Amino acid sequence: NKGVDGFRCDMAEMVPQAFWAWVIPQVKAKYPNILFIAEVYNPNLYREYLAAGFDYLYDKVGMYDYLRGVTSKNWSAEGITLQWQNVDDIRDHMLYFLENHDEQRIASGFFCGRGMCAEPAMIVAATLGKNPVMIYAGQELGEKGMDAEGFSGMDGKTTIFDYWGIKSLQAWANHGKFDGAGLDDEQRKLQTFY
Protein backbone atom coordinates (compact mmCIF):
# COMPACT_ATOMS: atom_id res chain seq x y z
CA ASN A 1 0.00 0.00 0.00
CA LYS A 2 3.09 2.25 -0.09
CA GLY A 3 3.51 1.88 -3.86
CA VAL A 4 6.54 -0.41 -3.67
CA ASP A 5 6.58 -2.70 -6.70
CA GLY A 6 9.62 -4.80 -5.92
CA PHE A 7 12.43 -5.74 -3.61
CA ARG A 8 16.08 -6.22 -4.51
CA CYS A 9 17.41 -8.56 -1.84
CA ASP A 10 21.10 -7.90 -1.29
CA MET A 11 23.18 -11.05 -0.76
CA ALA A 12 20.04 -13.18 -0.57
CA GLU A 13 22.15 -16.34 -0.41
CA MET A 14 23.32 -15.29 3.07
CA VAL A 15 19.75 -15.82 4.30
CA PRO A 16 18.43 -19.39 4.54
CA GLN A 17 16.30 -20.41 1.57
CA ALA A 18 13.63 -21.63 3.98
CA PHE A 19 13.05 -18.03 5.04
CA TRP A 20 12.60 -16.84 1.46
CA ALA A 21 10.32 -19.80 0.68
CA TRP A 22 8.15 -18.69 3.60
CA VAL A 23 8.23 -14.87 3.31
CA ILE A 24 7.90 -14.41 -0.46
CA PRO A 25 4.56 -16.26 -0.74
CA GLN A 26 3.31 -14.29 2.30
CA VAL A 27 4.03 -10.98 0.56
CA LYS A 28 2.80 -12.14 -2.85
CA ALA A 29 -0.48 -13.36 -1.33
CA LYS A 30 -1.23 -9.76 -0.41
CA TYR A 31 0.59 -8.07 -3.34
CA PRO A 32 0.61 -10.55 -6.25
CA ASN A 33 2.38 -8.24 -8.72
CA ILE A 34 5.36 -7.45 -6.50
CA LEU A 35 8.78 -8.57 -7.74
CA PHE A 36 11.60 -10.16 -5.77
CA ILE A 37 15.11 -9.89 -7.22
CA ALA A 38 17.96 -11.77 -5.55
CA GLU A 39 21.66 -11.23 -5.49
CA VAL A 40 22.96 -14.81 -5.52
CA TYR A 41 26.54 -15.40 -6.66
CA ASN A 42 26.63 -19.18 -6.46
CA PRO A 43 25.28 -20.61 -9.75
CA ASN A 44 24.74 -23.99 -8.07
CA LEU A 45 22.04 -22.34 -5.93
CA TYR A 46 20.22 -20.41 -8.66
CA ARG A 47 17.42 -22.90 -9.17
CA GLU A 48 16.85 -23.28 -5.43
CA TYR A 49 16.35 -19.53 -4.98
CA LEU A 50 13.97 -19.40 -7.91
CA ALA A 51 12.05 -22.30 -6.36
CA ALA A 52 11.93 -20.30 -3.11
CA GLY A 53 9.92 -17.64 -4.97
CA PHE A 54 12.36 -15.14 -6.43
CA ASP A 55 11.32 -13.74 -9.80
CA TYR A 56 14.80 -12.81 -10.97
CA LEU A 57 18.43 -13.40 -10.03
CA TYR A 58 21.45 -11.26 -10.86
CA ASP A 59 23.53 -13.06 -13.48
CA LYS A 60 26.79 -11.74 -12.05
CA VAL A 61 29.23 -14.67 -12.10
CA GLY A 62 28.04 -15.76 -15.52
CA MET A 63 26.95 -13.18 -18.05
CA TYR A 64 28.18 -10.03 -16.27
CA ASP A 65 31.67 -11.34 -15.60
CA TYR A 66 31.97 -12.65 -19.14
CA LEU A 67 30.67 -9.51 -20.86
CA ARG A 68 33.07 -7.47 -18.75
CA GLY A 69 35.91 -9.75 -19.84
CA VAL A 70 34.99 -9.37 -23.50
CA THR A 71 34.67 -5.60 -23.11
CA SER A 72 37.77 -4.82 -21.07
CA LYS A 73 40.10 -7.83 -21.21
CA ASN A 74 39.85 -8.93 -24.83
CA TRP A 75 38.21 -12.26 -24.02
CA SER A 76 36.72 -14.09 -26.98
CA ALA A 77 33.03 -13.42 -27.56
CA GLU A 78 32.58 -17.13 -28.35
CA GLY A 79 32.30 -17.84 -24.61
CA ILE A 80 29.05 -15.86 -24.37
CA THR A 81 27.27 -18.93 -25.73
CA LEU A 82 28.41 -21.05 -22.79
CA GLN A 83 27.21 -18.39 -20.33
CA TRP A 84 23.61 -18.48 -21.53
CA GLN A 85 23.68 -22.26 -22.04
CA ASN A 86 24.65 -22.73 -18.37
CA VAL A 87 21.34 -21.17 -17.34
CA ASP A 88 19.25 -21.79 -20.45
CA ASP A 89 16.44 -23.49 -18.52
CA ILE A 90 16.10 -20.45 -16.22
CA ARG A 91 17.41 -17.70 -18.52
CA ASP A 92 14.12 -15.78 -18.48
CA HIS A 93 14.70 -15.33 -14.73
CA MET A 94 18.27 -14.05 -14.98
CA LEU A 95 18.72 -10.28 -14.66
CA TYR A 96 21.48 -9.02 -16.93
CA PHE A 97 23.42 -5.87 -16.08
CA LEU A 98 26.70 -4.13 -16.84
CA GLU A 99 26.81 -1.85 -13.77
CA ASN A 100 25.48 -1.86 -10.23
CA HIS A 101 26.52 -0.46 -6.87
CA ASP A 102 29.00 -3.31 -6.27
CA GLU A 103 30.73 -3.10 -9.64
CA GLN A 104 32.97 -0.51 -11.22
CA ARG A 105 31.49 1.93 -13.69
CA ILE A 106 32.03 1.07 -17.36
CA ALA A 107 33.45 4.55 -18.02
CA SER A 108 35.84 4.37 -15.06
CA GLY A 109 39.55 3.93 -15.55
CA PHE A 110 39.21 0.60 -13.74
CA PHE A 111 36.89 -0.91 -16.38
CA CYS A 112 36.78 0.54 -19.88
CA GLY A 113 37.48 4.26 -19.66
CA ARG A 114 34.50 5.22 -21.85
CA GLY A 115 30.84 4.34 -21.55
CA MET A 116 30.54 3.84 -25.30
CA CYS A 117 32.96 0.89 -25.35
CA ALA A 118 30.31 -1.27 -23.69
CA GLU A 119 27.65 -0.70 -26.36
CA PRO A 120 28.20 -4.15 -27.94
CA ALA A 121 27.90 -5.80 -24.51
CA MET A 122 24.69 -3.88 -23.82
CA ILE A 123 23.25 -5.03 -27.14
CA VAL A 124 24.04 -8.64 -26.19
CA ALA A 125 22.53 -8.21 -22.71
CA ALA A 126 19.38 -6.57 -24.08
CA THR A 127 18.72 -8.89 -27.02
CA LEU A 128 19.96 -12.35 -26.04
CA GLY A 129 16.70 -13.37 -24.40
CA LYS A 130 13.43 -12.22 -22.86
CA ASN A 131 14.95 -11.70 -19.43
CA PRO A 132 15.17 -8.22 -17.88
CA VAL A 133 18.15 -5.90 -18.18
CA MET A 134 19.10 -3.38 -15.50
CA ILE A 135 20.57 0.02 -16.34
CA TYR A 136 22.20 1.58 -13.30
CA ALA A 137 21.60 5.31 -12.72
CA GLY A 138 24.12 7.26 -14.77
CA GLN A 139 25.22 4.30 -16.89
CA GLU A 140 23.27 5.71 -19.83
CA LEU A 141 25.33 8.90 -19.53
CA GLY A 142 28.76 7.34 -19.10
CA GLU A 143 29.13 8.11 -15.40
CA LYS A 144 32.78 7.55 -14.49
CA GLY A 145 32.55 7.07 -10.71
CA MET A 146 36.14 8.28 -10.42
CA ASP A 147 35.70 10.67 -7.49
CA ALA A 148 37.54 10.02 -4.22
CA GLU A 149 34.28 10.36 -2.36
CA GLY A 150 33.92 9.67 1.34
CA PHE A 151 34.14 6.18 2.77
CA SER A 152 34.84 4.23 -0.40
CA GLY A 153 37.49 6.46 -1.98
CA MET A 154 38.38 6.43 -5.68
CA ASP A 155 37.42 2.94 -6.79
CA GLY A 156 35.55 3.43 -10.06
CA LYS A 157 32.19 3.10 -8.31
CA THR A 158 29.60 5.64 -7.27
CA THR A 159 29.53 5.72 -3.49
CA ILE A 160 26.57 4.21 -1.69
CA PHE A 161 27.92 5.19 1.72
CA ASP A 162 27.94 8.98 1.48
CA TYR A 163 25.75 11.79 0.22
CA TRP A 164 27.37 12.52 -3.10
CA GLY A 165 26.39 13.93 -6.45
CA ILE A 166 26.51 11.85 -9.60
CA LYS A 167 28.17 14.26 -12.02
CA SER A 168 26.59 12.97 -15.22
CA LEU A 169 23.09 13.06 -13.73
CA GLN A 170 23.72 16.56 -12.40
CA ALA A 171 24.77 17.64 -15.90
CA TRP A 172 21.60 16.08 -17.32
CA ALA A 173 19.43 17.74 -14.64
CA ASN A 174 20.96 21.14 -15.51
CA HIS A 175 19.95 22.97 -12.33
CA GLY A 176 16.40 21.61 -12.37
CA LYS A 177 15.68 22.13 -16.06
CA PHE A 178 16.17 18.40 -16.83
CA ASP A 179 17.06 19.19 -20.42
CA GLY A 180 20.49 17.57 -20.68
CA ALA A 181 22.09 20.88 -21.63
CA GLY A 182 25.05 20.16 -19.37
CA LEU A 183 25.95 16.92 -21.16
CA ASP A 184 28.90 16.71 -23.51
CA ASP A 185 28.60 15.25 -27.03
CA GLU A 186 29.72 11.75 -26.01
CA GLN A 187 27.20 11.66 -23.15
CA ARG A 188 24.42 12.71 -25.53
CA LYS A 189 25.37 10.00 -28.02
CA LEU A 190 25.44 7.39 -25.27
CA GLN A 191 22.07 8.52 -23.93
CA THR A 192 20.62 8.22 -27.44
CA PHE A 193 22.03 4.69 -27.67
CA TYR A 194 20.33 3.67 -24.42
Question: How does the language model describe each region?
Answer:
Residues Y31-E39, Y56-G69, I160:
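Acidic, His- and aromatic-enriched active-site or binding-groove loops in soluble protein domains
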Residues L50-F54, S72-A77, C112:
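Short, surface-exposed amphipathic charged segments that create phosphate/polyanion-binding patches used
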Residues G79, D88-N100, R105-Y194:
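Loop/helix patches that line or flank the sugar-binding groove of alpha-linked glycan CAZymes
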Residues W20, I24-P25, W84, M122-A125:
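Short amphipathic alpha-helical segments and helix-helix/interface helices
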Residues D5-M14, V61-K73, E103-R114, H175-F178:
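The substrate-binding groove and active-site-proximal loops of carbohydrate-active enzymes
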Residues P43-Y46, W75-N86:
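Alpha-helical scaffolding within the catalytic cores
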Residues P25, Y49-V61, A148-F161:
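Aromatic- and acidic-residue-enriched segments that line the glycan-binding/catalytic groove
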Residues N1-Y49, G53, D89:
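Active-site neighborhood of glycoside hydrolase catalytic domains
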